[in-house]
Amino acid sequence: DNAEHPALLFVDTISSLGSIDYRHEEWKVDVTVGGSQKGLLLPPGLSFNAISSKALEAYKTSELPKSYWDWGPMLENNKKGYFPYTPATNLFYGLDEAINMLTEEGLDNVFKRHKRFAEATRVAVNSWGLEILCKNPEEYSDSLTAVMVPDGHDADFLRKTILDHYNMSLGTGLAKV
């Protein structure tokens, strides 16, 4: 790779796949992990992994214990067109339709739409007097805006109020930052 460094570059696209421009090969990412929820318009249930030849070679030669990152069995099953479990067929049909919808809108338009929504969200958050976790506007994501709720305030009540008054649904964090 251009960095000539043995480290592998892993990218989590769970919140952004299908929402913002992403180029696994062109940007020389080694491992990309994505999911069906969020930008691909589906419920959770499908996972996507893109693996560079560098990452695959590291996998093959590593003597470290593997569990989650053990791609060997899945790669062998893929060669045979076999799933080692009951596939979520309904999600595959949904994914096919979601890809059709994104293609019909055009990815550039999809990305612009997410940018508009993200900017509107940040304007709203600022107007409510709340703090955006990311301090550098140049690093804002157009697929996720993390908002800090001041001590002594109830985030669930805030989300319900925003939904009831502004018809804007906000997700919840997984843990306290």
Where are these regions (language model features)?
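Short glycine-/acidic-enriched loop or helix-start segments at secondary-structure transitions
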Residues: 19-22, 43-44, 137
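Conserved C-terminal alpha-helix-loop-beta "cap" of PLP-dependent enzymes
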Residues: 126, 130-177
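Conserved active-site segment immediately N-terminal to the catalytic lysine
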Residues: 25-37
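Active-site C-terminal subdomain of aminotransferase-like
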Residues: 37-123, 127
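Short coil/turn connectors at secondary-structure junctions
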Residues: 3-6, 27-29, 43-46, 166
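Catalytic PLP-binding core of fold-type I/II PLP enzymes
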Residues: 1-24
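Conserved hydrophobic/aromatic beta-strand scaffold that supports enzyme active sites
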Residues: 31, 46-50, 144-146
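General beta-strand structural signal in soluble alpha/beta enzymes
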Residues: 9-13, 32-35, 42, 134, ...
